[in-house]
Amino acid sequence: MLKFVVLLCAISCALGAAVPEGMVPQLDGRIVGGVATTISSFPWQISLQRSGSHSCGGSVYNSRIIVTAAHCLQSVSTSVLKVRRGSSYWNSGGVVVSVAAFKNHEGYNPKTMVNDIAVIRLSSSLTMSSTIKAIALTTAAPANGAAATVSGWGTTSSGGSIPAQLRYVDLKIVGRTQCASSTYGYGSQIKPSMICAYTVGKDSCQGDSGGPLVSGGRLVGVVSWGYGCAFANYPGVYADVAALRTWVVSAASSV
C-alpha cells in the first residue's frame, strides 16, 4: 500500500513495471493492528521467497499448487523462487521447496491491478498435515459486512523490522458496490475482479501481497493493493476469488 512518493518510486523500480500514481501493490509485508499466531491456525499460508527473503504470501490450493498475486511474479524467474510451508516463521522451520513453474492471469494489468492473481506449481508435492492444509476456493463472494481474516508476515509499523512470526488481523468484508461508493475513496478504481475488506486501524500492507483473505473457512480474496496502510476510508483491496475461480481451477491444471 502506498505510503509516500519515495516508496512508490522504489517499488515501481523493484517491480520493473508501471504502477499508477497513488496505487502500490503490497510487496513488503505488514499486518497492521494484528497479533502473532501459529501456522496450525492458518495451515494454508505459505511464504513465497525470492533469493532467500520473504517476498509475498500465498495459499495452498492442493499438494502441488499455490495461489498468489500476479504482481508478486513480475520480472522474476523460477530459479530464484522458493516456497516455505508448514512453519509459523518465514525464515526457519517447515519445508522449503523450489518452484517449477508459475502462471499469471492473462488479463492482469499492473496499471489498474485487475485480475491480480496467479498460480504456482511446486517442484515436489506437499505432504498434508496439521500445519499444511489446502483451503477451498469460495464459489460466491461473501456478503458485505461478513467477518474475514487476513494473515501474513512483515513489519507492523512504517520503517520497522520484519517480525519472523506469522501474524493475522480480523476484518470485515466491504462488497464491491460498497467499496466503489462515495463512502470510501476509490470510486471507479474498484473493478469486477476486486473485493475489499476494512476495519478501522487494521489492514494488510506491503508484502502481505498474494496472501489469503479468508471468510467462512474459504479463500475469498488475495491481497492485492490499496492506498496507505489502514488509512481511514480506504479499505484493503483484494483479488476476488469468486470472480476469478474459474481461471484458478483451469490454470492449476495446466501450469
Swiss-Prot record:
EC number: 3.4.21.4
PROSITE patterns reported in the protein's UniProt record: TRYPSIN_DOM (PS50240), TRYPSIN_HIS (PS00134), TRYPSIN_SER (PS00135)
Annotated site, Required for specificity, chain positions: D203
Record-linked SUPFAM superfamilies: Trypsin-like serine proteases
One Gene Ontology cellular component annotation held by this UniProt entry: extracellular region
Any one of the GO BP annotations: proteolysis
Keyword Protease: yes
Compartments (UniProt record): Secreted, Extracellular space
Disulfide bonds: C56-C72, C179-C196, C205-C229
Active-site residues (renumbered): H71, D116, S209
Signal peptide span: 1-16
Coiled-coil zones: none
Protein name: Trypsin alpha-4
Source species taxonomy: Eukaryota, Metazoa, Ecdysozoa, Arthropoda, Hexapoda
